[in-house]
Amino acid sequence: MSNESIKAEQDLIQEGVESEVSTEEASLIDELTQANFRIEELEQLLADALAKVEEQKDSVIRAAAEVDNIRRRAAMDVEKANKFALEKFANELLPVLDNMERALQGTNPQDETTKALFEGVELTQKSFLTAVAKFGVKPIDPQGQAFNPDQHQAIGMQPSAEYPANTVMLVMQKGYELNSRLLRPAMVMVSQGGPSQESASINIEA
């Protein structure tokens, strides 16, 4: 076989090998391209899934917060209802307490004929006040205290050498509160002070 024939045969073999290699390379490139596309698709699906998870997590957190707020408001409403449910009933009891107070004021404890009555009414009043105090009802008796417009209702003012100005000198009717909430203000007479206090006031201003 001549050299030319050998060379021609080698060239054919090389071309065949190169063609086969090119085909395999093209196939590998195509597979890699498809794999990259699939990876991108999977990454996008994963990103979408994570976004949905975050969205659902936020929804769950918001829902839990709303449930907690509703539960807290409901508890406050129940507490408020329980605290002041007796308000109407307590107001109905005030005339009874007033009548017992007037009965004590109109009875002389030193008089043997009325002493037993006084002691009986006094004992009943104490028991009654103890009972209603368990439900938060307490009397407001501001005798000798500074006038407080939030708890006292002044029915007038009078000069007094005994009580300083703007001091409750006489309680006409006790007030009452329910769990620190005013049921009825105390009806009071307020001191204007005495002449000496008026002079002192003038001297201070001078």
Swiss-Prot record:
Signal peptide interval: none
Keywords annotated in UniProt: Chaperone, Cytoplasm, Stress response
Stored InterPro entries: GrpE (IPR000740), GrpE_coiled_coil (IPR013805), GrpE_head (IPR009012)
Primary location: cytoplasm
Gene Ontology cellular component list: cytosol
Pfam families: GrpE
A Gene Ontology molecular function term of the record: protein-folding chaperone binding
One Gene Ontology term from the biological process aspect of the record: protein folding
Subcellular locations according to the entry: Cytoplasm
Top-level taxon: Bacteria
UniProt cross-references to SUPFAM superfamilies, sorted A to Z: Coiled-coil domain of nucleotide exchange factor GrpE, Head domain of nucleotide exchange factor GrpE
Quaternary structure and partners: Homodimer.
Annotated family: Belongs to the GrpE family.
Function: Participates actively in the response to hyperosmotic and heat shock by preventing the aggregation of stress-denatured proteins, in association with DnaK and GrpE. It is the nucleotide exchange factor for DnaK and may function as a thermosensor. Unfolded proteins bind initially to DnaJ; upon interaction with the DnaJ-bound protein, DnaK hydrolyzes its bound ATP, resulting in the formation of a stable complex. GrpE releases ADP from DnaK; ATP binding to DnaK triggers the release of the substrate protein, thus completing the reaction cycle.
PANTHER family, alphabetized: GRPE PROTEIN, GRPE PROTEIN HOMOLOG, MITOCHONDRIAL
Matches recorded under HAMAP family: GrpE
Protein's UniProt name: Protein GrpE
The species this protein was found in: Shewanella sp. (strain ANA-3)
Highest classification ranks of the organism: Bacteria, Pseudomonadati, Pseudomonadota, Gammaproteobacteria, Alteromonadales
Gene: grpE
